[in-house]
Amino acid sequence: MSKDRDGRRTSRRGTLKKIGGFSLGALSFGAVGRTQAATGSSVTTADIAPPGPNGDPKSVQIDDKYTGAEMYGEGDFRVGLGTDLTMYPPVYRESLGNGSGGWEFDFTVCGSTACRFVDSNGDVKEDDKAKEMWWQEINFNDINQDLYSRNDSDWVGSTPADTQPEFDYTEFALARDGVTLALTALNPAMGSLALGATYFLSDMVNWIASQHEDDSSLKRKWDYDGLSGPLYADSSTYLLARDEMTSNSYESFTIDNIAVAFPEFPVRTKYYVTFTAPDDPSTQSISTLEEEGIYRVPATEVAAARPPGSRRSKSAADEMVYVADPKKFIEVEPVKNPSIPDRIYEEIEQKKKQRSRKQ
């Protein structure tokens, strides 16, 4: 992190987050607002995980659930949230850091929710949907390096929506796998509710309702509340993020995934995350790299793995790329039973007042 001429903190985030000529921080969307995709900024699997022996990501799933009374007196229902956090192998590229080299830590956060009525025993009735979803949000807090996301369809998506997707998430491996793993956490929380990834992905579109980011936080939010009230019983979100780090540095932050159902039922999953960027691999011996689990991939192999028109050009074929073992350089700790932030209850009350004024 550096300072500009006015003494303000600056970083590559301000440049990296530019989409189609405008900054993400200035954007605000309607309840079902479609984002604009940036030309030439798509992400390929080769960008996230170049070929090599360290290609297996590190994934952790957690869930939360709450059972309460349906807002119109139709009985009790349960809202469940399953979250998958998948960390991909750290990648070193000589082109980062204005040519001085640096590490990319890519990860996805996928959250799936379901609302179902329960019987007199408190067991979920699988086919009895409670259309009570209100909103979902993902928050990264305590950021101190160049952690960012984009608005492109292969960086963010959500279902439900009442429009057909312009991007086929069922064919996108990162979203498909992330939602599938999120469901492995959601299903036990919802009494082994039988839901498949395609159920969500076939309706997923590239949109967010609102967002915020500054030097220490990043937030994406999806509102599912229609003008006439709640319309959906299920929802799912997908978010890809990237942390660009200098060699021999570390980053610790938290990830929150929160879902809220009517009339006032929030559920929350939370992780503590630490990234440790290895030393500059170009200065290390082969034996040291092997000992630390770092593998060198010639960029010609990486370029060959990318489809035509991918974000990274083959003109960088002389760049050497290194891939590190995520198990050695990434720590993820799920937080047990995190409390609901006061701001969520405050927002619930504010939204209730807004709804009452409209009615």
Swiss-Prot record:
Signal peptide limits: 1-46
Superkingdom per UniProt: Archaea
Membrane-traversing stretches: none
Source organism (scientific name): Haloferax mediterranei (strain ATCC 33500 / DSM 1411 / JCM 8866 / NBRC 14739 / NCIMB 2177 / R-4) (Halobacterium mediterranei)
Keywords of this entry: Antibiotic, Antimicrobial, Bacteriocin, Plasmid, Secreted, Signal
GO cellular component: extracellular region
Record's protein name: Halocin-H4
Phosphoprotein keyword on record: no
GO BP, one annotated term: defense response to bacterium
Protein role: Has antibacterial activity against other haloarchaeons. Interacts with the membrane of the target cells where it causes permeability changes that result in an ionic imbalance leading to cell lysis and death.
Keyword Transcription: no
Subcellular location: Secreted
Annotated segments matching region Disordered: 40-59, 340-359
